[in-house]
Amino acid sequence: MKQYKILLIVADGLGDRPVSKLNGLTPLEAANKPAITDLLKNSMIGLMDPISPGIIPGSDTSHLSIFGLDPHVYYRGRGAFEALGAGATLSHGDVAFRGNFATVNNDLVVVDRRAGRKLEEGEQLVKELNEKIKEINDVKIKFYKGTEHRIAVVLSGKGISDKVSDTDPHHEGLKVLESKPLEDSNEAIRTAEIINILTRKVFDVLNSSEINKRRIEQGEKPANIVLLRGAAHYVKLPPFSSYTKLKAAAVSATALIKGICRELGMNVITPSGATGGIDTNYNAKAKAAIELLKENDFVFLHIKATDAASHDGLVEEKVKAIERIDRVIGAIIDNIGRDNLILMFTGDHVTPVEIKEHTGDPVPVLLYVPYPIINDNVGDFNEKEARKGSLRIRGLDVTNILLNYSNRAEKYGS
């Protein structure tokens, strides 16, 4: 029995709700999708709950689930994945945080949680932080540049804990929070103290940085604080190949996703021009996926643009992103051949552009196979048509479904 290559494409934040600017259509309905539409005659579609019905997924927990790992078992926090994706090498016991470069006033009240989002000087600021803040109370501190305004911070040393609260207030106009222990342990108390010292030191370094002085002169907001959240002890994940028997690779520019995929043992590629934003290089991502499909059984292609547009409320940009993803799918199919692979296209969660945050709605999912199946006889792929389809799955079902339809699944029982 022929075994097929597997291509899993996740458009981050793909799903949506009816949008007033689109006369009640969703971006997926409004988008022109000829390549996707052409696959429908040999596809099943439906809805996926990334975690379970009504649960609002993070991109971290949803991707763990999609890769076949129960987040209730394997999830300890996002910080470690962000750090791995940003290039950190973690050891057992390290505590990692995800964070944002942000703008605060002299009273540490947040003016902009993203320091304008675009931060071309990010690498220089990280270098300056690493040069000037190396250790606090015998705990080593290391900073890593993430995507756009994002940053990862790793604490290494004895007697530290991930049971501490965030310093990120999550809203502008509020003061940077004091980190507090989340359990009554010496390790948690000590770690919270270190984080609070770190917050002040980071502000002192960044607020006096010549880089930020130039940003102010140029009319830009200074990136003069790091807001921390998602503390996580490093816990090793099982390799993807150990439970799928697949040689796997991934294409992504987003630190979190790169971190998860690397930890799963996938070969992770970030092609030139791939940004993890709405300005990403779609052609480069398509070409990278095509090359990886030649050498791997499974290729995961992650595109962040749909989610970035949603969080900023950019309706037209989300529609354009979906149309560009459609062209990516068309280019891959044309190159690899529709008879040589199965393809799943979905999102990791719903991010409605009018809400600008994740919701617990089910996500539309499409599964194309290159051989005769009972298709769902729908005319389009969108949130409404998906409700007519045969698939009603959880994120945890995705990997098993892909193994089954690629003729790679093993029998359960005798």
From Swiss-Prot:
InterPro entries: Alkaline_phosphatase_core_sf, ApgAM_prokaryotes, Metalloenzyme, Pglycerate_mutase_ApgM. The keyword Isomerase applies. Transmembrane segments: none annotated. It comes from the Archaea. One of its GO terms (biological process) is glycolytic process. It catalyses: (2R)-2-phosphoglycerate = (2R)-3-phosphoglycerate. Pathway: Carbohydrate degradation; glycolysis; pyruvate from D-glyceraldehyde 3-phosphate: step 3/5. The keyword Lyase does not apply. Keywords: Glycolysis, Isomerase. Its EC number is 5.4.2.12. GO terms for molecular function: metal ion binding; phosphoglycerate mutase activity. Belongs to the BPG-independent phosphoglycerate mutase family. A-PGAM subfamily. This is 2,3-bisphosphoglycerate-independent phosphoglycerate mutase. It comes from Saccharolobus solfataricus (strain ATCC 35092 / DSM 1617 / JCM 11322 / P2).
